[in-house]
A protein has these predicted regions:
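Active-site helix/loop module of the DD-peptidase/beta-lactamase fold
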Residues: 80, 99-137, 160, 187
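Short, basic/aromatic recognition patches
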Residues: 32-46
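Catalytic-site signature segments of enzymes, centered on catalytic residues
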Residues: 75, 142-187
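A short, well-structured edge-of-sheet supersecondary motif
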Residues: 43-73
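Sec-dependent signal peptide recognition
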Residues: 2-8
């Protein structure tokens, strides 16, 4: 139950954050006392489990029923969503594939000719959208930590990471690959 509620709340927050326009404050609704108590109970359970939840917002009919900012969460700052992004990004790729906008067999480098390193390895050249989706892009370790705090151009940084294994050969959890999928969908 708690996991389901968390997923629902995280999904609502993510969907709301997809619109980058700032149209001012969202309208507010009135939550029932029962709903507010349930949310307070949920947040207490999250805290008791030492989970690092930064923010939560629940909307109904376009109105905010519940909103809380904790830890690193701030209402006026962009927030890294980490693994929540994987579900929505892969869904966006699925829609793009079903609409014929891309194929899972498209080469990753074909989307970013302006961001390629001076020398493109055979493994990087062989990397496809499918490899990003299945986290088998050829990296031996997750390169995500190389970029998100220090680099401005994540696409160039990803493409510059050595692809030491043949794509499709080895699984490596790779959040950076999810970013690349989002960059491909945006193209």
């Amino acid at each position: 139950m708690k996991r389901s509620l968390f997923c629902i709340c995280a999904s609502a927050l993510l969907l709301m954050s997809c619109n980058v326009q700032d149209n001012g404050p969202l309208p507010r609704g009135k939550a029932s006392a029962e709903f507010t108590a349930a949310m307070d109970s949920y947040l207490a359970a999250v805290s008791d489990a030492d989970q690092d939840l930064h923010s939560i917002m629940v909307l109904k009919d376009g109105k905010v029923l519940f909103e809380k900012w904790m830890s690193l969460g701030k209402p006026d700052e962009a927030h890294v969503l980490n693994s929540v992004s994987k579900t929505f990004t892969s869904t966006a790729v699925g829609f793009a594939v079903s609409e014929g906008l891309l194929s899972v067999d498209d080469k990753v480098i074909s989307f970013f000719p302006e961001d390629l390193p001076d020398e493109v390895s055979g493994n990087l050249e062989a990397m496809t959208v499918r490899h990003l989706l299945t986290m088998t892009c050829g990296h031996e370790t997750d390169p995500t930590g190389l970029a998100w705090k220090t680099e401005k151009d994540w696409t160039k940084t990803f493409l510059a990471v050595p692809v030491t294994r043949k794509p499709g050969e080895v699984y490596c959890y790779n959040s950076f690959g999810t970013y690349m999928l989002s960059a491909i969908v945006q193209k």
